[in-house]
Design a protein with these regions (language model features):
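Hydrophobic or amphipathic alpha-helical targeting/insertion segments
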Residues: 55-89
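N-terminal phosphate-binding loop and adjacent alpha-helix
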Residues: 29-55, 289
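Short HxH-centered metal-ligating active-site micro-motif
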Residues: 44-52, 63-67, 538, 546-548
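Feature for intrinsically disordered/low-complexity regulatory segments and propeptides
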Residues: 100-103
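Phosphate/ATP-binding catalytic cores across multiple sugar-kinase/actin-like superfamilies
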Residues: 279-305
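Extreme N-terminal starter segment of soluble prokaryotic enzymes
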Residues: 1-4
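Flexible beta->alpha loop and helix N-cap segments adjacent to enzyme active/binding sites
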Residues: 7-25, 33-36, 79-90, 97, ...
Length: 609
């Protein structure tokens, strides 16, 4: 059975193709269009996933959209009625688009699919999943568990913002829901907006900023903005929010509560107030997630937990669940946001609707390496066309040569194999560097990534060595768990109370300072030989040369740009930044060997997110 899953028209459009219970391919549209968080119909992603099986739309058994547009339209109308006359202007502006996109969605999808394949005639093949079921399916059906609780947390789907389900064998049963406008994801996004970052894009910046502050406003949030019950259920006080009726997340009451106006631009100074506010909403989020997790464990007595939805990308909160040992096992879908809804929609149809027999696969996600790959011949041809000078190193010396460059302090663009599906670079479209360097975080943030100095970098570590460096002794292949640095590798702080806010940034905290956040934590990727042999071998070579089995791993892009997809993207990013080396498959490109006329001004190419 060939099933295409599709998500689009909100943010992070994507497509995924299943051949029975095998993920053939999956990719986000942004990687092809180079428009970050592209919400448009995923023409390019669909063409790619179908090409991996060499089939056309008309050969598919089903095309499954990730949510139900009629239910979403119902929510939009009922919300307007509930809050009327507030929001009349936004309602009038939005209703024509809602009618087109929600009431005639099936025809809209059919027309777009026919552009890709004029022979596609069967409208009945187009199916619809529910938004939170798609999220839940993307997590449970890719997990190694026969029986698990499933917690989905995001902004909003049709009505649900939080759902608790039970996955057993090939079925998912939703047990509990919290409905719009009461949403943990939207609460976090409201603070993202208030702090001057982009909604549905900058939430991870709030999480990264939080350790620079103190949670001074947690009580204020819990007293005024959200009514949190003992079981983790909650209600927002809509007096302070405009997202249900307007185009803004917060209103004047919100500003009055915190005695400060919205930070309008990301170029405005970040003050201690902003850092304390980030720390506070992160603290409240962790409190709520932990309460929900503990309550559902107590109620259902199931030892496994699957996490999905945009809030599941909050790796700090995920790490707290792990640290509290509420569950024996935790699985997090690497594409937890709406992009992963494409995969989940296809899986929900396969199992829940078609009753396909489920086989447990310990690597169902294939490391999340589900995107395009390029042969040596393809890459070499592009290098010649672009007039790029390159060298080949013999296989037996390849990894040692790259590790030597890393030891010399080089920042390297690492382009190998299949592109990752989801927001994280996991060693195939990565920028890598030596984590032992005290200056590397500043170099990468300011000269390579062109992003804020407070942003932390993640470590990739050999799986067998993870507990040498971190308070973690389990798999974290998708960079979705945060854990503390081991005490043994910390550098003693002789003045623990003298530095505040951004002053903490330049203090050396461990023997791997470039991946140690200011609170002595790290967002960890464990690297496994079975899923990424090349990256594993590079870490082995670096360990052999330096004694350190950790590398900085950050996504191969600049701020505001999607992760690079093809060799041309990689070359442009390399030539437009202060990357020293580009490695694509076996080809090694040194910046100093290139004609200066090829260098690009990349800093202003993308709108900063």
């Amino acid at each position: 059975m060939l099933i295409l899953g599709v998500s689009c028209f909100y943010h992070d459009s994507a497509a995924a193709l299943l051949d029975n219970d095998n993920i053939v391919a999956a990719a986000q549209e942004e990687r092809f269009t180079r428009v970050k968080h592209d919400a448009s119909f995923p023409f390019n992603a669909i063409k790619f996933v179908l090409s991996e099986k060499n089939i056309q739309i008309s050969q598919l058994d089903a095309i499954v959209f990730y949510e139900k547009p009629f239910l979403k339209f119902e929510r939009l109308l009922e919300t307007y009625i509930a809050f009327a006359p507030n929001g009349f202007k936004s309602f009038c502006l939005s209703i024509p688009l809602w009618i087109k996109e929600k009431l005639f969605q099936k025809k809209n999808l059919f027309d777009k699919l026919q552009i890709l394949d004029p022979n596609f005639k069967d409208l009945t093949k187009i199916k619809f999943s529910e938004h939170h079921l798609s999220h839940a399916a993307s997590s449970f059906f890719t997990s190694p568990y026969n029986n698990s609780l499933i917690l989905t947390l995001d902004g909003v789907g049709e009505w649900a913002t939080t759902t608790v389900g039970i996955g057993k064998d090939n079925k998912i049963d939703i047990k509990k829901e919290i409905h719009f406008p009461h949403s943990l994801g939207l609460l976090y996004s409201a603070f993202t907006y208030y702090l001057g970052f982009k909604v549905n894009s900058g939430e991870y910046k709030v999480m990264g900023l939080a350790p620079y502050g103190e949670p001074k406003y947690s009580k204020l949030i819990l007293d005024h903005l959200i009514d949190l019950k003992i079981d983790g259920s909650f209600r927002l006080n809509m007096k302070y929010f405009d997202f249900a009726t307007g185009f803004k997340m917060t209103n004047k009451n919100f500003e009055k509560l915190f005695q400060s106006k919205v930070r309008i631009s990301e170029s405005d100074n970040l003050e201690q107030f902003h850092m304390d506010l980030a720390a506070s909403i992160q603290d409240v989020t962790e409190t709520i997630v932990l309460k929900i997790a503990q309550n559902i464990k107590d109620e259902f007595q199931i030892d496994n937990l699957c996490l999905s939805g945009g809030v599941a990308l909050n790796c700090v909160a995920n790490g707290k669940i792990l640290k509290k040992k509420i569950f024996k096992n935790i699985w997090i879908q690497p594409a937890s946001g709406d992009a992963g809804g494409a995969l989940g929609a296809a899986l929900a149809y396969l199992y829940n609707e078609k009753n396909f027999t489920r086989r447990i696969n310990l690597d169902f996600m294939k490391g999340s390496y589900l995107g395009p790959s390029f042969s040596d011949a393809q890459i070499e041809n592009i290098l010649k066309i672009e007039k790029i000078k390159y060298k080949n190193i013999k296989d037996e010396n390849f990894y040692d040569y790259i590790s030597e460059l890393l030891e010399m302090g080089m920042a390297i663009g690492w382009f190998q194999g299949k592109m990752e599906f989801g927001p994280r670079a996991l060693g195939n479209r990565s920028i890598i560097a030596d984590p032992r360097s005290e200056n590397m975080q500043k170099k990468l943030n300011l000269k390579v990534k062109f992003r804020e100095s407070f942003r932390p970098f993640a470590p990739s570590v050999l799986r067998e060595d993870v507990n040498r460096y971190f308070e973690l002794d389990c798999d974290s292949p998708y960079m979705l768990l945060v854990a503390d640095i081991k005490n043994e590798i910390k550098v003693k702080d002789n003045n623990p109370n003298t530095l505040f806010g951004i002053e903490k940034l330049n203090q050396k905290r461990s023997i791997i300072p470039a991946v140690t956040h200011v609170d002595y934590s790290a967002r960890i990727q464990t690297v496994h030989k079975e899923t990424n042999e090349k990256f594993y071998k590079l870490l082995q070579a670096f360990k052999k040369r330096t004694g350190c089995s950790v590398l900085i791993n950050t996504s191969f892009n600049v701020r505001g740009e999607p992760i690079v997809c093809d060799p041309k993207d990689a070359i442009k990013c390399f030539l437009g930044t202060n990357l020293d080396i580009l490695v694509m498959n076996k080809f090694i490109i040194h910046k100093t060997n290139q004609d200066s006329s090829l260098l690009l001004d990349y800093k202003n190419k993308y709108e900063l997110d």
